[in-house]
Amino acid sequence: MNRYVSLLKSWCDGLIEYQIKELADSTLNGAFVCPACKNTHGRCDNAMFPMMYMFNETQDEKYRTCAFGVFDWQKNVLLRDYSVYNDGNNEWRGITVFSAIGYLKTLINFKEQLGNRAAEVEKRCKSMCEWLLKNLTVNFVCNINYIAANSGAMALAWQYFGNEKYRKISEDLLNYCLEFITENGLLFGEMFPRNSVSRRGCTAVDIGYNVEESVPALLDAALILGDEEKIAKVQKLLTAQLDFMLPDGAWDNSFGCRNYKWTYWGSRTSDGAAAAYYRMKDRDPQFETAALRNIDLLERCTHDGLLYGGPDYYKWGERACVHHTFCHALGLADALVLGIKPKDNGGELPLDKPCCSIKYYPEIATYRINSGDLIADITAYDFGENSFVAGRGHATGGTMSLLFSRKYGVVAAASLSFYRTAEPLNQQLTLNLEQHAPLTFRIECSDESGIYTSALDTTAELTARKNESVITVTAQGTLTNLEGRKKTGAEYILKYTFESDCVTIDAELASADKGCVFIAPLIGDAAKITTASRDKTREIFNLVPGFIATEHSMCFENGKLSFKLSFQK
C-alpha cells in the first residue's frame, strides 16, 4: 500500500470513528459528528466514493458499511425533488451537484462493489442529475464554482447514463465558464453577479476555489466531452494557477475574495487539486509535481486520521473539521483511481527558482515580487468590500499579504482583518479568543470609535519599481475601519524594499498618536525584526490560514517607523 493510499485509509478510518452508529432513531445514524463544529455536515455523503475506493482496495466491510451509512443519512436533507439541503438548517441546494459528482464517480468506478444497493444509488443519482439539468443553469443565483461543477457533473452523467441532454448542457456550461478568464489566465466569477467589477476594476478571483473545485470540474467536462480546444483552454488555467503554488505545495490565497476559507493547503469545503493536475501530467510534467507536493502538504496537516484546517491547528489545540477530510478524501480517491503514487524526486514548479522580478495582476490589484529567495504579494484588492463587515475582509490597502522564503518557508500570511463567520456552518470558532488575532501586516489605530487599519483601505494606491536587484513597492492610503469609514487625518505611506535576502518596511502616518502601532505577525522562527522602535511581542494564532505567529507591535515615533526583516536559523 503506497503512502497516498495509506493517507486515504487514515482519513477513512478517522471518519468512521466519528460516524453516528447506534442512535435509537436509526434515521439519524450515518452522519459524521464534527469535533470542531459540534454538529453534522450535510455533505457527508461525499465520503461514499473514497469509502468505496478503500473497500475495493482492502475488502474490509467497514468501509462499505460507512459508505451506505452516509448514503442513508442523506435522506434527512434530501428533498422530494431530489435536491439536497446544504445542512439540516441551511436551505442552500446548490451542493446537490457535489452529491451527484460523488455518486457518479462511485457508479463509474465501483458499481459492482455496491452490490444489491447499486440500483438505489443509481436511481437517486439520476434524479439528482435531472434536478441539476433543469435548475443549475447559468441563470442560477450562484458563484461560478457551481456552474463549473455542474459542467463536470453533467459530463459524468452523460458518460454514465448516455443521455445526450446531459452532454449538451455540460458543453454549454463549459463554454460559458471559459468566458470568465482574466488577462493573466485566472478564472473569475467567484461572487454573484459573476461578471461584477469592483471600483478599481478588479474581478472576483479566489485561488482556493479555482484550484480545488472549479477548474478540476471544467477539466472533467472537457476531457469527457473530448473537446481538444476546451482541454487546451483548461490546461492554460492549470498553468496560470501554478504561479500561486508555493514551493511547499501550498496555494497562495492570501488576497482571495473568499479567503475566509483559506487553509494554506487549499479551501475548507472543496475537494482538492491533485487529481486534476495528475490527470494532465502527460501534457506538462510540472503538473504531476504540483499534485504530489500538494498531497504531501495535506499529509503533513493530517493527525489522528483527520485533515486539519491549517499547518498549526493541531499544535495550537484546535480541532479538525471533518468537512476537510471527507471532501479531500474524495479528491484523493479520484487521484488514486488515476494511479497517482509518491515520488522521491519530483520536477520543478514556477516559484522554485530564485529570481528578481515583479509582476502586476490588475484583476486582483496585486504585485507579485520575486527577490532572490523571497516571494511576496503586495495587494490593494478591493473586490467584495461591501461584504467585509459580514466576515469577508481579506487584506487590501497595500498589505504585504504573503512573504515566503524559499529557504525557510512561510514567514507572513494574511488572515481576515476581523474573523467573523461569513458561512457559519462552514467555518469553525476558536475557544481561545484572547490569542486569536489577525496574521495580517498592518498599521492599526484604536480610539473611542473603534479600530482603524491600513489593511482595510480599498482605495489605497500602489506603485512599484525595480532598480537592478532591488524592488520597491509603495502604498498610500488612509486608515479605515471594518465598515469602510476612514479615520480623519490618518493618511499613511508604506514602503517595502526587497533585496535578495531581506525586506525593509518604512511606514509614515499622519497624526500618529499613542494608539497607533505597526503590527507584524511573523510565522516560524527564521525571520528576525531589527528596529529602533519599541517592540512588544506576544504569541497568536488565526484560523485563517491556520498558523501560530509571534505578533510584533511597534510604536511610531514622530509619525514614522522603520524595521528590517532578515533571516537566520
Segments (PLM) and residue ranges:
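Surface-exposed beta-strand/loop patches in extracellular or lumenal glycoproteins
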Residues: 514-525
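Extended polysaccharide-engagement surfaces of secreted carbohydrate-active enzymes
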Residues: 228-231, 243-515
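Beta-strand-rich recognition/accessory modules
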Residues: 537-569
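Long, well-ordered core segments of solenoidal/helical folds
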Residues: 3-31, 64-83, 120-140, 164-191, ...
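Long, contiguous hydrophobic alpha-helical segments, chiefly transmembrane helices and signal peptides
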Residues: 67-70, 74, 94-95, 148-151, ...
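Aromatic-lined, polymer-binding surfaces characteristic
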Residues: 36-56, 60-230, 258-266
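A generic secondary-structure signal for well-formed alpha-helical elements
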Residues: 107, 158, 181, 241, ...
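Short aromatic-acidic-glycine turn motif
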Residues: 525-535
